[in-house]
Each structure stands twice: as structure tokens, then as C-alpha cells.
């Protein structure tokens, strides 16, 4: 009995609140096997096909590439993208991508050469011989991302799980109407999917591995059971069909009975989830050595004549796939990427297929029905009953319309999975999911701006702190420089002063050069002394002539010369206090000539007259008296106010002096004759 209850608990499944049962519409496309689509002539590969930043380009325009060649480098959460076929890179430019607003993303545009040549592939058939880190790195570098719709990098997800994961869940529910990509993949490639699941289990080492699949896929269930017949490490759980049981939080609750907390992740409760398409891509990356260059896409809707599931190369234009399926557009044709509840309408058909593209729905006008007018909310609470996340959609609707971001956040709008169940049941035809998407985008923009402001504030505060530190260090340096020198500094200063005094004392002492030292000037000194002795002897031999020469006339001339020098000095002082007078060189020359003539005349007179005895003491006294008078006149000239000089008067005086000099010279010539 105990074993029976244990077995019952082992296969037990739970339920979640809310949910709806829309028409499935899956039989249009799940009855035909997977098929290949002819290569498009041109491929557009967006660099960003996942959650996170785009990778770094490693190709340029004009490069030839092979299928599987990396177009970008993957570092951190930057997932690389690879060439879907061989060809030539003709452009690297923005191009519209798979987005509700058809936003432009930087893309690599390749012209296919039709050869479809692969790069050299190196598979790891014995993946167990490699470490966990090596497997995760290979999965990341081969561009594997979540193919269920989220597009989160698989390698990053496996790395973040670490040792906390106790349950690995493989999501095979595929609950949205029309989509059968996973269903057909499980029917055609069940063995490869199970091998990929085992690689994931080898990396994570969980206690249990669960596959959750809805009961509306009988062929896929039978194929998986056949592959898992001898396997005891993987459990297949068939769950009731209910939308949105394929949501990550909803499927976790169905299979484990655990609820992911608000704002948390499934890894917080020891659960990690991967899609069956992701498991297949992991097998091809690790075992076959093939990067992800294609995926299964459902082509369905009444506007296509050949619905089914195809292997679509990444970067293939949507128009090319629909034309291969027999697309017959109407006047106002609508094409939806994704399902009717969570998908979005494409503005044009040149958008490329990316890693998260799982379905292209081309419905007819009668299939989708006429658009209905949006009406006011009647507070019926039907949306709250259908919400699988236990939210209050009608309150979130009012908060979103009123721009009440704080209240919307407090009511856990971030937990909305945008499944569209509330909009499906709304009797007023309110597009609630559109309001919620817009509100979440605005909240994210506000948070991003707040983050930038906080970072800018932190940078400013760090700069201010750095400036304060530099200022304090500067003041400390100035303060230390102003401190009195220490005792050892005083000793150094005293020694320097002593050296200076010693040098000064040496400079004042007479320099005595010993004979024989360098330079030796003794011979020159002796010659000079000999000349002086000869001059004295000669002077002693002619005392009469010397006394005659040094008679009264020369003494008188010396006195006059002293007086002239005093006058000249006085005039210089007056010139220093008065404005400078123009100097006449001719006048100075005339005056000098007159003085020489007078001196010559006096000498002649002295030669004709008998020489009077000269008293040297008397001559010295007279010269001293003359110098004293000259000095007194200089002092008086310095104390008296300077008279203004008249240049015309000076010129007249100079002319008179020249005339007198000529007359004196003529008179001297007459006297000599």
C-alpha cells in the first residue's frame, strides 16, 4: 500500500488558477512531416536575437562566409550569431526585425552562393569526457538560446543555475493555438531531443528530470515513450490541455506544486526549465558540432495553401517562407509572428526569421473575425478569473491608463506573462495586453533613467571626494613647509653661513704671489722698477728745467683746469635737474682749442721771462683752495633751483665763442711772426 501511495505521489500533477480553453486549431499543420525550404537568394541576420546585448562583429563587407561561421563574438551575455549559408557579406546595416514595432537592428546581409557549404565541424560524441564548464562554453559559442519564445542565452542560464537546481523540466506543452513546431519536432526527432536532455542533465546533475506535455499531442507522446522505454532517469508527465499551461511558472506549478515567488525566478525554488527545441539545438551543438543556423517554424492559417512545419534558416525573409507555403494574400491581409494570443502583427513581410520565431500565422478575414470596437470596462472581473498569474488585470488597466506607475508596480505588473487570457475573455474588447506591455516599457524606461541618474550622482560625489582629498593633501604640504626647521636643519644652516663667511674673509685678504709660482711676474715687476729709477735719475739731472716748467704759469694752468672741471661738474648737475640741452661738438672743440692756445702762449711767455722759484707747498695749498671753492660751488648749484635753458641763447653764445677763438688764433699767429 505504501508503494502504491508513493507511486501516486510520484506521478501527481497539480493545477493553477485561471486559464482558458480557446480553439486549438493545430490540425492544420501537425499532420505533415518536417520539410526543407529552398534557400532564399538573400539573408538578413540581426546581431541581436536574444535577451542581452548584441555581439561584436567579426566580419566586414565583402567577406566570404561559410554556413556555421561566426559573424559576431560572444562574451558574457552577448550571444554570437552564425551564417545560415555560404555566400558573401554585401552590407552591414540596420534592418527591421521581429518586433511589434518592427524596430531596426544592426544586421549582416548575405548574398547566398547556392553551394551551402559548411565550416569544418567537430562534434563531441563522448560529451561525458568533457567538463561542465567546457560544455557550457560550447553551447554558448554555438549560439544556442531559448527557442520557446524568450530567447534567453542557454549557456548563461545553465551557468547561473549552478548547484541549486534539483529539478530539470523540459517544456513540451506548446499550449498556444495554431503552433505545432514542437509537436512535429518531437514526432520526427524524439531520439535527438532525449539525447539533448541527457546532456543538460549531465551539466546540471539534478535529482529528477521531468518532461511536461499536453494530452492533445498523442503522436508526440507515443514517440517519446518509445524512446524512453528503457530510461529511468527521465519522467514523462502528460498534463491536461489548458492555456497557458506552457508558461514557465504555470508548468512549474503543475509538475512540482511549487509557486515561483513574486519578482523571483524558478531557480529560486531549485527548478530550471528548457524547451524541447532548445534541447534539440544543444544536441546538435555538442554532439554534431553545428551552430544554430535553422529552426522549426509553423506555417499555418487559411491564407496558405500548404500549411505545415519547415526547417527555416535564420535570416530568411518571411515573404520567402510564405510563398513556399502557397501564400494567397487578401486585400487587408494580416500576418502574425507567433500565436494569435501572444504574437504580434508584422508591418511588412521583409522581416527575417530569428531564433524566437516559432510560427507564422496568415489567417483569412473570416478566420480572425472583424475587429470590434473597444468599450469601457464594466468591472465584471472576468479577466481576474482568467489570469493564471493571480493578478488583477482591471486594476492594472486603470493604473496603466492613469500613468500611476507606482501603483502598477505595487500590484505586480512585472509578473504578467502577457498570455492574453484576460483580453480573450474581456466582454468590452479591451486590448489589455497592449496596455500592460506599454506600462511595463514605461516603467523600465523610468528605472533606467533613475539608474543613470544614480550613477551620475555617484560619479559626481566621487569627484567631489577626490577634490577634497587633493585639497587636504595640498594644505598638509603647505603646513609642513611652513613649520620651523628642526635642530639638524639649524646645524646645516650654520655650516652654510660659516662657509660663506670664510669665503668673504678670503676675498678681502691680499693675494701674495711667491716668486717661482704660477703665474710668475717677477721679471716684469723688476723691469718696471728699473724704468722708474731711470726716470727719477733723469729728473734729478735737470732740476732747473723742471723747476722752470713747473713755474707759475703751469701752476696757474692747473688751477684753471681745476676750476674748469668744477664748472663742468656744476653744469652736469644742472643738466641733471634741467631738461637736457643739445650738445654742440663744434663748440666743445673750439673751447678746447682756445684753452690749448692760451696754455701755449703762457708757456712761451714763461720761456722768455726768467723763471721764478716755485714753492711746491704753496702750489699744493692753492690747488686745495681751488678744489674747496669748486666743491662749494657744486653744493650751491645743487641747492639752487635750476634755470631753464634757452637753446637760441646757447647757439648765439657758441657762435660768439667761435668768432673769439678765430680772432685769438689770428692774433697768436701775428704775435709769433
UniProtKB/Swiss-Prot annotation:
It is found in: Cell inner membrane. Its cofactor is [4Fe-4S] cluster. Binds 2 [4Fe-4S] clusters per subunit. Its EC number is 7.-.-.-. InterPro entries: 4Fe4S_Fe-S-bd (IPR017896), 4Fe4S_Fe_S_CS (IPR017900), Ion_transpt_RnfC/RsxC (IPR010208), Nuo51_FMN-bd (IPR011538), Nuo51_FMN-bd_sf (IPR037225), RnfC_N (IPR026902), Soluble_ligand-bd (IPR019554). It holds the Pfam family SLBB. One of its GO terms (molecular function) is electron transfer activity. It is a peripheral membrane protein. [4Fe-4S] cluster 2 binds at residues 387, 416, 419, 422. Belongs to the 4Fe4S bacterial-type ferredoxin family. RnfC subfamily. The complex is composed of six subunits: RsxA, RsxB, RsxC, RsxD, RsxE and RsxG. NCBIfam families: PRK05035.1, rnfC. This is Ion-translocating oxidoreductase complex subunit C. It comes from Salmonella gallinarum (strain 287/91 / NCTC 13346).
Amino acid at each position: 500500500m505504501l508503494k502504491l501511495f508513493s507511486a501516486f505521489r510520484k506521478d501527481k500533477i497539480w493545477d493553477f488558477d485561471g486559464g482558458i480553453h480557446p480553439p486549438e486549431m493545430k490540425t492544420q499543420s501537425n499532420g505533415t512531416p518536417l520539410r526543407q525550404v529552398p534557400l532564399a537568394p538573400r539573408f538578413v541576420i540581426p546581431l541581436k536575437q536574444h535577451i542581452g546585448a548584441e555581439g561584436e562583429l567579426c566580419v566586414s563587407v565583402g567577406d566570404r562566409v561559410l554556413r556555421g561561421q561566426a559573424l559576431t563574438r560572444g562574451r558574457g551575455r552577448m550571444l554570437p550569431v552564425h551564417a545560415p549559408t555560404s555566400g558573401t557579406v554585401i552590407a552591414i546595416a540596420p534592418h527591421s526585425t521581429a518586433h511589434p514595432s518592427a524596430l531596426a537592428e544592426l544586421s549582416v546581409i548575405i548574398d547566398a552562393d547556392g553551394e551551402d557549404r559548411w565550416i569544418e565541424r567537430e562534434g563531441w560524441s563522448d560529451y561525458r569526457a568533457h567538463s561542465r564548464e567546457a560544455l557550457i562554453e560550447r553551447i554558448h559559442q554555438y549560439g544556442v538560446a531559448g527557442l520557446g519564445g524568450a530567447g534567453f542565452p542557454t549557456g548563461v542560464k545553465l551557468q547561473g543555475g549552478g548547484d541549486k537546481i534539483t529539478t530539470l523540466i523540459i517544456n513540451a506543452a506548446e499550449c498556444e493555438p495554431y503552433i505545432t513546431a514542437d509537436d512535429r519536432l518531437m514526432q520526427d526527432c524524439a531520439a535527438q531531443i532525449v539525447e539533448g536532455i541527457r546532456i543538460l542533465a549531465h551539466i546540471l546533475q539534478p535529482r529528477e528530470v521531468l518532461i511536461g506535455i499536453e494530452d492533445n499531442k498523442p503522436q508526440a507522446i507515443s514517440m517519446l515513450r518509445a524512446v524512453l522505454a528503457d530510461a529511468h532517469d527521465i519522467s514523462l508527465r502528460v498534463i491536461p490541455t489548458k492555456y497557458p499551461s506552457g508558461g514557465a511558472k504555470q508548468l512549474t506549478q503543475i509538475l512540482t506544486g511549487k509557486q515561483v515567488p513574486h519578482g523571483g525566478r524558478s531557480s529560486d525554488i531549485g527548478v530550471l526549465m528548457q524547451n524541447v527545441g532548445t534541447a534539440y539545438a544543444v544536441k546538435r551543438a555538442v554532439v554534431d558540432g553545428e551552430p544554430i543556423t535553422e529552426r522549426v517554424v509553423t506555417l499555418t492559417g487559411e491564407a496558405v495553401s500548404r500549411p505545415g512545419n519547415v526547417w527555416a534558416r535564420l535570416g530568411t525573409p518571411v515573404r520567402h517562407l510564405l510563398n513556399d507555403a502557397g501564400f494567397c494574400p487578401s486585400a487587408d491581409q494580416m500576418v502574425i509572428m507567433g500565436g494569435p494570443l501572444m504574437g504580434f502583427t508584422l508591418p511588412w513581410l521583409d522581416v527575417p526569421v530569428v531564433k524566437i520565431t516559432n510560427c507564422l500565422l496568415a489567417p483569412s478575414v473570416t478566420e480572425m473575425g472583424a475587429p470590434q470596437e473597444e468599450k469601457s470596462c464594466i468591472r465584471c472581473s472576468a479577466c481576474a478569473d482568467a489570469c493564471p498569474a493571480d493578478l488583477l488585470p482591471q486594476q492594472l488597466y486603470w493604473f496603466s491608463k492613469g500613468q500611476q506607475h507606482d501603483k502598477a508596480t505595487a500590484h505586480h505588473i512585472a509578473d504578467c506573462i502577457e498570455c492574453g487570457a484576460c483580453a480573450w475573455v474581456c466582454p468590452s474588447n479591451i486590448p489589455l495586453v497592449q496596455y500592460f506591455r506599454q506600462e511595463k516599457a514605461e516603467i523600465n524606461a523610468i528605472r533606467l533613467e533613475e539608474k543613470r541618474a544614480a550613477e551620475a550622482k555617484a560619479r559626481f560625489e566621487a569627484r567631489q571626494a577626490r577634490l577634497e582629498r587633493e585639497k587636504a593633501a595640498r594644505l598638509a604640504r603647505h603646513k609642513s613647509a611652513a613649520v620651523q626647521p628642526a635642530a639638524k636643519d639649524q646645524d646645516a644652516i650654520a655650516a652654510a653661513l660659516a662657509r660663506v663667511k670664510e669665503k668673504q674673509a678670503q676675498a678681502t685678504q691680499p693675494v701674495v704671489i711667491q716668486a717661482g709660482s704660477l703665474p710668475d711676474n717677477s721679471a716684469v715687476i723688476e723691469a718696471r722698477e728699473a724704468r722708474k729709477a731711470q726716470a727719477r735719475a733723469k729728473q734729478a739731472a735737470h732740476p732747473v728745467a723742471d723747476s722752470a716748467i713747473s713755474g707759475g704759469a703751469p701752476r696757474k694752468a692747473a688751477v684753471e683746469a681745476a676750476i674748469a672741471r668744477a664748472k663742468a661738474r656744476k653744469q652736469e648737475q644742472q643738466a641733471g635737474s634741467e631738461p637736457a640741452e643739445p650738445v654742440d661738438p663744434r663748440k666743445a672743440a673750439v673751447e678746447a682749442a682756445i684753452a690749448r692756445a692760451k696754455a701755449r702762449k703762457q708757456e712761451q711767455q714763461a720761456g722768455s721771462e726768467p723763471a721764478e722759484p716755485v714753492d711746491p707747498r704753496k702750489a699744493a695749498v692753492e690747488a686745495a683752495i681751488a678744489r674747496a671753492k669748486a666743491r662749494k660751488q657744486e653744493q650751491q648749484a645743487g641747492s639752487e633751483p635750476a634755470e631753464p635753458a634757452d637753446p637760441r641763447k646757447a647757439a648765439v653764445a657758441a657762435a660768439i665763442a667761435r668768432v673769439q677763438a678765430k680772432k685769438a688764433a689770428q692774433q697768436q699767429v701775428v704775435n709769433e711772426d
